[in-house]
Structures are given as structure tokens and as C-alpha cells.
Regions:
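Cell wall/extracellular polymer interaction/catalysis modules
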Residues: 1-151, 165-174, 180-184, 189-195
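Soluble non-cytosolic domains of exported or imported proteins
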Residues: 160-163
Length: 195
């Protein structure tokens, strides 16, 4: 798993012109990093959280995740006629807040429009020419206890492979939300952004 440190994350964000939150304790940088193999159907991406702990120490936690839909949804003919939504790399300021995933458990839910690509012909290759922007129900949630294949776990959501990692992310979010409010910024980068 790719594990960039504080300085690498900060530099990648700066290169893109994105904010990187360094002021204040528990001011979260919630960052997804997409692996170059889009069509893997595995949890080969990483979701990380960079923050200053209460004593001022810089921390980065990394968790296996997917930022891509599972194969099931990519080929599902009953999905949106345009194809499954795939979140575009970018920084989405204040775009997520706590809500319920499928009405079942707390997670981070989309609260502002996001930009997505589609796989219109369902060949597991992104159609970069068309960009949709809107409310797509993209959440940041968990898979199973320790999942290895994405399959049905993601229809475009950002999904952590392990329940324990997800619970840790939500613990950090809750602590941050008490200080900075309920909305959190999510940044999606690619591994190429670190080269």
C-alpha cells in the first residue's frame, strides 16, 4: 500500500493548488489516493488522514480503500444509462458530512455537488470526455470486516476495506467536527501526483 508522509501529501496538494490544513489540532486532511490500475476490483487505493494531534505532532494514518466502483456496478445494465459514476480527482471543499449509509449506519455522505466521469459502454475504461456534476449519493463508508474484493461494496463511493479503519476515520471526523463544524473537505489524488 502506498503510504505518503505528511510532507509528500502537503507537496502533492500544493502542486495542484489545493488547501492543506495545518492550523489547529485535529483539522483533518481527508485524502484518497487512486492507484494507477483502475480496473483491478481490489482495495488497491488508499485513504489517509493527515492532522495535528492535540500536542502538535503531525500524524498521518493510511487505510486500504477503493476510490473506484466494483466490477458488479461497472457492468450493471440497470445502473444509470450514462454508466456508473466515478469520482474525478479534485478537492471537494466541505462536500461531506455525517449521515447514514443506506439508512443503516453513520458514514460521511455527499452534501455538495461533485464531479464524476462515466463508463458509458461498461468496458471498465473511463470515458474522460464527459463530465457530470451533481448529487450522486457518493459516500465514504466501509466494506466488511476485512474485504479483499470491491464487487458490490462500491457503486462510486469511496470505501474503506476494513471496518476497524472506518471506525477510526469516523472517530477522527467526530473529534474534528466538534472543533470545526460538520462539513469536511475530501481531496482525491492519484499516485501520479506524487511523482
Amino acid at each position: 500500500m502506498f503510504k505518503p508522509d505528511w510532507n509528500a501529501l502537503k507537496a502533492a496538494c500544493a502542486k495542484k493548488g489545493y488547501a492543506f490544513f495545518e492550523r489547529g489540532r485535529l483539522n483533518l486532511n481527508l485524502i484518497g489516493i487512486r492507484h494507477s490500475d483502475y480496473a483491478s476490483n481490489g482495495f488497491d487505493d488508499v485513504l489517509c488522514c493527515a492532522y495535528m494531534d492535540p500536542d502538535g505532532t503531525k500524524r498521518v494514518e493510511h487505510w486500504p480503500a477503493t476510490t473506484d466502483p466494483g466490477w458488479h456496478w461497472l457492468k450493471d445494465e440497470f445502473m444509470n444509462a450514462k454508466g456508473c459514476a466515478v469520482l474525478m480527482p479534485g478537492q471537494y471543499r466541505g462536500a461531506f458530512a455525517e449521515g447514514l449509509h443506506k439508512g443503516k449506519y453513520p458514514c460521511l455522505v455527499q452534501v455538495k455537488p461533485l464531479k464524476v466521469w462515466r463508463d458509458r459502454n461498461r468496458d471498465r475504461t473511463l470515458d474522460h470526455a464527459s463530465i457530470d456534476e451533481g448529487m450522486f449519493g457518493i459516500h465514504i463508508h466501509k466494506a466488511g470486516e476485512a474485504s479483499v474484493q470491491v464487487d458490490r461494496w462500491s457503486a462510486g463511493c469511496q470505501v474503506l476495506a476494513r471496518k476497524a479503519d472506518f471506525l477510526r476515520m469516523m472517530e477522527l471526523y467526530d473529534a474534528s467536527a466538534r472543533l470545526y463544524g460538520p462539513r469536511v473537505t475530501y481531496t482525491l489524488l492519484t499516485e501520479r501526483d506524487f511523482g
